[in-house]
């Protein structure tokens, strides 16, 4: 402080030789006051910048938390959907294997009937031990009387009905 007042005195003496000590004290006090106000204003601006930075970081944290929550929700939904589709795929794979096995068995039966068809009588093929169809004049079966082809339990006597796959909702 002594250096600033001595500097001021040297400059004031160059102004005209007015060496009034009260004037120099007033100007030094006014400079101190201005510097103090300037420092306060600078500190206030610094605090405001710091607070704005903290507020910006808080807003960024909130935004990232929301994004993280949305991603976790999306991941949960996707995982549940994946598990559901995987379960359906397992059921469909099991049904496909079952149907493939049935198809293979039916193809083996067809191959057996076709390869040994001449050796089997019709009564052996229909599974009942007899043939209730009548042979017409031309040597072909006469199926005009359809009631003779129906058994008393409500089904056809013939066993070559298609085999249906189990329904997915049956389990």
From Swiss-Prot:
Its main location: nucleus. It comes from the Eukaryota. Residues 29-92 form the bZIP domain. Residues 31-52 are annotated as: Basic motif. Residues 1-54 are annotated as: Disordered. Residues 57-71 are annotated as: Leucine-zipper. Gene3D superfamilies: 1.20.5.170. Residues 1-24 have a biased composition (Low complexity). The keyword Nucleus applies. Keywords: DNA-binding, Nucleus, Transcription, Transcription regulation. Transcription factor that binds to specific DNA sequences in target gene promoters. BZIP2-BZIP63-KIN10 complex binds to the ETFQO promoter to up-regulate its transcription. Forms heterodimers with BZIP9, BZIP10, BZIP25 and BZIP63. Component of a ternary complex composed of BZIP2-BZIP63 heterodimer and KIN10. This is bZIP transcription factor 2.
